[in-house]
Amino acid sequence: GLSDTTSEAQRHAVAITDYIKGNIDTTTSVCHGPSGLAFQSVGESTSTLGEVKNRADLVIYWGGNPAESHPRHFGRYAVTPKGMFTPNGKKDRTVVLVDVRKTKSAGVADILIRPKPGKDFEILWALRALVKGNKLSANEGEWFWGVNIEEETGVSLETLTDLAERMKNCRFGVLFFGMGLTMTRGRHFNSGALLALATDLNKYTHFVAKPVRGHGNVTGADNVVAWQTGYPFGVNFSRGYPRFNPGEFTTVDTLSNGDADAALIIASDPGSNFPKKAIDHLKNIPVITLDTKS
């Protein structure tokens, strides 16, 4: 759990888990888990939302629909608010939406790019090549192995080239990515490609990448657990030192496999989204819940 509590409480939760040689996991394992894996392998060029509000003149939403999932995101941080270096609000920003379908978020987008489902990795890798000034093919519009880019991804080379140039020439750019990127084919490789693209762009301008996440302090939980153990979620202390293995030490798997004999749930609600097998095991073991509401 730990998603809706303070970083100080999260730190103590890690200490308790270490003391009893237990298992600690955050809600990331059922949400932006692939992003957590990508952070571990690629790193993250990031910033605060305050910096985005005050500086960003290019805002890209990739695989998310914040108009419905985070309805205040546009108004408070990324699209319409007036900032120190964006005094005219929306007029000072270019908003790009990359999604497989036209969602409600498309209403604020200046540019809508609709790739084929499951082709995010190919598009991101093509953008990395274009940003670095590489030609994708000797023949216009084709990959090196002769596959037409638009036929493969649903996005034309002209569109990708225009986006790459906008990214390189902005003053401050931000890539917000959602679970439409992380929970489709490619998983953490998709997140890693996007994070690597943001890092590449810092050779030309200031560019950051941020996951659009749920819950109050789930990012804080990942940061605290990573700070204390070296791993962001799904950490096991049974041998007296931290071990990380998603698929074994993540909560859904621990419960579904019947490995847990007691559970302490802190500031989260696994009952609302865990699979039936995990919930059934949770019913058969002692459970302590620390939450502000029942």
Language model regions located:
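Catalytic alpha/large subunits of respiratory electron-transfer oxidoreductases
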Residues: 1-294
